[in-house]
Structures are given as structure tokens and as C-alpha cells.
């Protein structure tokens, strides 16, 4: 089984776009959808009002930006042996799950490139499938410029590749998952990628660019991550496993699991 883990914090309209993409999937392998919720308001009610079903919602308290713990919680409750990490606000191809799964390889992350769309383009493609959305977005000069840059990255296949990815669950757990010491925006994915490559993992790049819908920038995140010092400490520690992770969570608050 495949577990598709979608990180969520409010912005239900963006989540709906991603869930609708997942509903359209053409996949020969059984998969589950897990929402990793960082303390959204009224999420279950909105899902029920919009008729969504067969979804597992794993929610923790809203105690600030805790993406690492949020994702680890989802993995703890997952049934699949292969994990695909996504965020809300993404538009993916109708065969996304199947084609990602077909590229699977032990000790390998399948890494996703994405193009962050303008507000105007995002409004035009809201509700469209991937192919139609790409057609509309291609009329945007900024989108075309970004895609040219992403195409170069695809050809170069850089060794370092933070961000969203897919991998075998057993490999993720072997590294003790994401480090939950990263509280606040930024660098948890860079640190995981650093450990992954330092201790025998490799990166494979998915061959299509995902679309990321516009949403207002959160000024509280700042330009430089508050986690820079912790990131440097962990990279210099020489440890394969996260300090606080899948097996030893950070924080005393319990998460809640609901099935709809």
C-alpha cells in the first residue's frame, strides 16, 4: 500500500484542490490519504461539508509551526510501506501516484520539483486538472521562465535535493524521520536531505513539474530561518538519525486521529 501524506494548516481551498487531484488518480496500487494537520480550525467540518471520505486526519495542537512533528505523526499512523509527502495547494498529474511508485527504489528519495504560480494564474486554473492547468499556466511569461530553470535542474540532477519527496517507509524510519527539533519555518527538509545523502541514500528526480497555487506570504516566517543554528548543529553532529523524531517525539501534547 502507498500512503499519501498531505501537510495541512487552514487554507481549505488549497487543500480541496490537492484532494480533488488525488480523487482523480489512475493508480493500480492501493493507496490511503492522510492529512497531517498542524492544528487547523474546523478542518473535519469542512471535509464533511464537502463530501470527502476515506481520509485519515492526524491532528496536533496549534502550538506554532511544527511541520517535522506533524509529518512524523502522519507516518506513525500510516499503513503503507511507501510514503509520498505532499503539501496542500498542489496540482499533480492524474497518474502522479502510479508514476511515482513506478520509480521507487530502496534507499532512494524521489524528489519533486514544483513551480510556484502567480496569484492571477492560480485563479485561472483553480479547479482544473493538471494538463489543463499547465496549458493555461503556459500563457504566463513568469511561469515559462520558471519552467526553463526547472528543466535545467531536471537535466543536471543535483546531488542535494530538499523539499517534497517519496520513499520507502522503512528507509524513512531508519533515519528516525524528520527532526522535530525544527520548530518554526525552514530547514527541516534540508537537514533530512543532508543526513539521507551522508549515510547512503540517493536522490531521484521526478520527471514532471508540479504546480503550486499562490497563497499570501507569511511574513512571520522571515527571510532567514530561525532554525539555522539548530541546522548547523545537527549537520555537524555526525548522526544518521534525527535527535527527536519518529521513535522519540518532541513535545508532550498528544495528537488526535479521526477517520472520515
Cite the ranges covered by each PLM segment.
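Short, acidic, metal-binding catalytic loop of nucleotide-sugar glycosyltransferases
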Residues: 20-30
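Short beta-strand/loop segment that forms part of the nucleotide-sugar
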Residues: 30-39, 58-60
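A conserved acidic beta->alpha catalytic loop
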Residues: 36-46, 90-91
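Glycine-rich, basic loop-to-helix element that forms the pyrophosphate-binding segment
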Residues: 61-78
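Short aromatic/hydrophobic "clamp" motif used to bind/position activated sugar donors
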Residues: 83
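Conserved donor NDP-sugar-binding/catalytic core segment of glycosyltransferases
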Residues: 95-133
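Short, flexible, basic/aromatic active-site loop/helix in glycosyltransferases
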Residues: 130-157
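C-terminal catalytic/acceptor-binding lobe
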Residues: 160, 181-260
Amino acid at each position: 500500500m502507498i500512503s499519501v501524506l498531505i501537510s495541512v494548516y487552514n487554507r481549505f481551498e488549497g487543500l480541496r484542490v490537492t484532494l480533488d487531484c488525488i480523487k482523480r488518480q489512475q493508480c493500480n496500487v492501493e493507496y490511503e490519504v492522510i492529512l497531517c494537520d498542524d492544528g487547523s480550525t474546523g478542518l473535519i467540518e469542512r471535509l464533511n461539508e464537502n463530501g470527502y471520505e476515506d481520509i485519515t486526519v492526524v491532528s496536533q495542537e496549534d502550538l506554532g509551526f511544527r511541520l517535522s512533528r506533524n509529518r512524523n505523526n502522519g507516518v506513525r499512523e500510516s499503513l503503507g510501506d511507501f510514503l509520498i509527502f505532499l503539501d496542500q495547494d498542489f496540482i499533480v498529474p492524474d497518474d502522479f501516484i502510479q508514476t511515482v511508485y513506478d520509480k521507487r527504489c530502496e534507499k532512494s528519495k524521489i524528489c519533486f520539483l514544483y513551480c510556484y504560480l502567480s496569484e492571477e494564474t492560480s485563479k485561472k486554473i483553480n479547479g482544473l486538472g493538471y494538463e489543463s492547468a499547465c496549458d493555461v499556466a503556459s500563457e504566463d511569461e513568469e511561469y515559462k521562465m520558471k519552467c526553463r530553470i526547472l528543466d535545467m535542474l531536471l537535466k543536471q540532477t543535483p546531488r542535494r535535493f530538499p523539499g517534497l519527496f517519496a520513499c520507502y517507509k522503512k528507509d524513512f524510519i531508519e533515519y528516525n524521520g524528520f527532526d522535530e527539533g525544527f520548530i518554526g519555518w525552514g530547514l527541516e527538509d534540508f537537514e533530512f536531505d543532508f543526513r539521507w545523502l551522508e549515510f547512503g541514500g540517493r536522490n531521484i528526480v521526478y520527471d514532471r513539474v508540479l504546480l503550486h497555487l499562490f497563497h499570501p506570504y507569511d511574513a512571520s516566517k522571515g527571510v532567514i530561518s530561525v532554525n539555522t543554528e539548530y541546522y548547523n548543529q545537527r549537520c555537524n553532529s555526525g548522526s544518521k538519525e534525527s535527535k527527536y523524531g519518529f521513535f522519540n517525539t518532541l513535545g508532550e501534547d498528544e495528537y488526535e486521529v479521526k477517520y472520515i
